[in-house]
């Protein structure tokens, strides 16, 4: 691939005439031009391109630098030293060349550019051109090329004196100044760019961008940590679930061999059905049991007791018998049943069930001889806390299910009974309203106490009739019955009406009694 010339050289080539004479003259001058081109190629100046252009160091649209100026001056001086011959010299040389054989002059060595531009002193071997004198003619016959009428031009060289020390110093100073100026300009340009870059970096916009970038980086790191922690948690949960599944499978495999042809899904469906059936069965049993407790006779009031009495009976007796003198020797409960008339059905409450005497789980309470029928609606009823439903009567009224409502360990032994001073302190610390209400009542009618221990929303309660309650018959409802229904008030005739935890269903636990509520 050759180099392309400029448009000016192309136009010049078009308008240049190409005649035969010019071609002949060009053919004659070809060896000289070739020799000159070789010398110029060696020196590196004026190299011609393909289309006749010269390769100059000076650009077209740029002012030459100091180094280029120095090099151009050196080239100009070299051109002055190398002067072409005059026409007279050409004629003389042509005559001598025809008369005498061809003598080829030796071209003197011209000092190169580096020796001219360098501040070092030029050696005399390089500075002075060597002149070769013509050799004597050889005895050989002349060659046909020498006899030919070709004209050989002879060149003359002018002796160049050696530059003085001042000239060398001036050249060295110029070169050093040019080089130092170039280095200074380059360093100044770099420093100028650095200062501009620092000004941009230290500006407010760059600081704001940096702060935003740091915030985004912090947010990104936070999101990445959250995602990583969530993934780790998911992996831990999955591993835990897999571990539980393997344990479940191993526990199932440890059982007997399963010969069924059912799939795992069918087995799971059947298992869920069994569980649902068990839950429904328990609910239905609880519902039926609660209704059974509601419909039972009030006979269970004398059965569900600790040693024949409820848990709160000791506190009731203590409130009733505060006016009575304290006995150091506790009385024993009477095991003989009270006489029962045809139109009266009551229970005698003895003083033996105070906190000073321990309750015995083996004590019995004789039930009435005649069965008590279920009362009519809107009459008092006490539910029995037993599953038997009154089918069979036993000598001991304490049933197996009585442990749900009676707790014998809560009764205090005799040596832990409160003394007179302790009772006085308890009475002093009690509520003043209760002390004011404790007014003495007449002997024929005792004070009535009502303690809503149970839940009224179940419409159930327990009734304990006193000596003054009037019952016309076992099957007839009394006028002083306690009716615990929704949106109804508590009615009672006599000296005692207590709603106990016996009336609560099996699904609801007992609540502790709060005397200050």
Curated annotation (Swiss-Prot):
Subcellular location per the Swiss-Prot or TrEMBL entry: Cell membrane; Cytoplasm, Cytoskeleton
Regions of compositional bias (Polar residues) in chain numbering: 89-99, 343-367
Positions of region (Disordered): 1-60, 81-147, 324-407, 425-452
Gene Ontology CC annotations of this record: cortical microtubule; plasma membrane
Pfam families: DUF4005, IQ
UniProt note on tissues of expression: Expressed in vessels of roots, cotyledons and leaves, as well as in trichomes.
Record's compositionally biased regions (Low complexity): 328-342
Domain IQ per the UniProt entry, residue ranges: 168-196, 197-218
Keywords (A to Z) from UniProt: Calmodulin-binding, Cell membrane, Cytoplasm, Cytoskeleton, Membrane, Repeat
Region (Calmodulin-binding): 1-11
GO biological process: plant-type secondary cell wall biogenesis; regulation of secondary cell wall biogenesis; response to calcium ion; xylem development
GO terms, molecular function: calmodulin binding
Record note on disruption phenotype: Formation of abnormally large and round secondary cell-wall pits in roots metaxylem vessels. The double mutant iqd13 iqd14 exhibits larger secondary cell-wall pits.
Comp. bias intervals (Pro residues): 134-144
Basic and acidic residues biased stretches: 432-448
Claim: Membrane is one of the keywords in the record: yes
Residue spans of biased composition, Basic residues class: 40-49
Protein role: May be involved in cooperative interactions with calmodulins or calmodulin-like proteins. Recruits calmodulin proteins to microtubules, thus being a potential scaffold in cellular signaling and trafficking. Regulates the formation of oval xylem secondary cell-wall deposition pits through microtubule-dependent lateral inhibition of Rho GTPase domains, thus confining the area of active ROP domains within the lattice of the cortical microtubules. May associate with nucleic acids and regulate gene expression at the transcriptional or post-transcriptional level.
Family note: Belongs to the IQD family.
Record text on subunit structure and interactions: Binds to multiple calmodulin (CaM) in the presence of Ca(2+) and CaM-like proteins.
Listed name of the protein: Protein IQ-DOMAIN 13
Organism of origin: Arabidopsis thaliana (Mouse-ear cress)
């Amino acid at each position: 691939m050759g180099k392309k010339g400029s448009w000016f050289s192309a136009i010049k080539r078009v308008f240049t005439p190409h005649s035969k004479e010019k071609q002949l003259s060009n053919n004659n001058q070809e060896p000289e031009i070739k020799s000159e081109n070789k010398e110029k190629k060696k020196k590196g100046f004026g190299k011609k391109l393909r289309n006749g252009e010269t390769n100059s160091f000076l650009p077209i649209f740029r002012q030459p630098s100091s180094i280029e100026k120095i090099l151009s001056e050196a080239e100009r001086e070299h051109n002055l030293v190398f002067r072409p011959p005059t026409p007279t010299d050409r004629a003389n040389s042509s005559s001598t060349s025809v008369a005498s054989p061809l003598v080829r002059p030796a071209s003197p060595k011209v000092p190169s550019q580096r020796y001219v531009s360098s501040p070092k002193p030029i050696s005399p071997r390089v500075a002075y051109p060597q002149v070769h004198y013509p050799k004597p003619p050889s005895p050989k016959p002349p060659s046909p090329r020498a006899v030919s009428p070709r004209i050989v031009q002879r060149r003359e060289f002018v002796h160049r004196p050696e530059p003085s020390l001042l000239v060398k110093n001036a050249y060295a100073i110029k070169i050093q100044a040019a080089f130092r100026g170039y280095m200074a300009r380059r360093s100044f340009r770099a420093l100028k760019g650095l200062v501009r870059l620092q000004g941009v970096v230290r500006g407010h916009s760059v600081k704001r961008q940096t702060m935003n970038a740091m915030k985004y980086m912090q947010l990104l790191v936070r999101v990445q940590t959250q995602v990583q922690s969530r993934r780790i948690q998911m992996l831990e949960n999955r591993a835990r679930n897999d571990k539980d599944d393997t344990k479940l499978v191993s526990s199932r495999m440890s059982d007997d061999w399963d010969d069924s042809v059912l799939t795992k899904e069918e087995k799971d469906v059947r298992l869920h059905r069994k569980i649902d059936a068990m839950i429904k069965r328990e609910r239905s049993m609880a519902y039926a049991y609660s209704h059974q407790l509601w419909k039972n006779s009030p006979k269970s009031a004398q059965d569900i007791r600790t040693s024949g009495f409820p848990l709160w009976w000791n506190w009731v007796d203590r409130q009733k018998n505060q006016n009575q003198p304290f006995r150091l020797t506790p009385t024993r409960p009477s095991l003989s049943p009270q006489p029962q008339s045809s139109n009266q059905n009551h229970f005698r409450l003895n003083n033996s069930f105070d906190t000073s005497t321990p309750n015995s789980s083996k004590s019995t309470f004789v039930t009435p001889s005649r069965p008590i029928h279920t009362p009519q609606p809107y009459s008092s009823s006490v539910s029995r806390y037993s599953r038997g439903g009154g089918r069979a009567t036993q000598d001991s009224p304490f049933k197996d299910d009585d442990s749900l409502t009676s707790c014998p360990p809560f009764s205090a032994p005799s040596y832990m009974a409160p003394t007179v001073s302790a009772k006085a302190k308890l009475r002093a610390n009690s509520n003043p309203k209760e002390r004011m209400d404790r007014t003495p009542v007449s002997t024929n009618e005792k004070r009535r106490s009502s303690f809503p221990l149970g839940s009224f929303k179940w419409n159930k309660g327990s009734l304990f009739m006193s000596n003054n309650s009037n019952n016309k018959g076992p099957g007839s409802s009394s006028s002083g019955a306690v009716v615990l229904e929704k949106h109804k008030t508590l009615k009672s005739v006599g000296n005692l009406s207590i709603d106990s935890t016996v009336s609560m269903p099996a699904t609801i636990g007992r609540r502790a009694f709060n005397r200050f509520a």
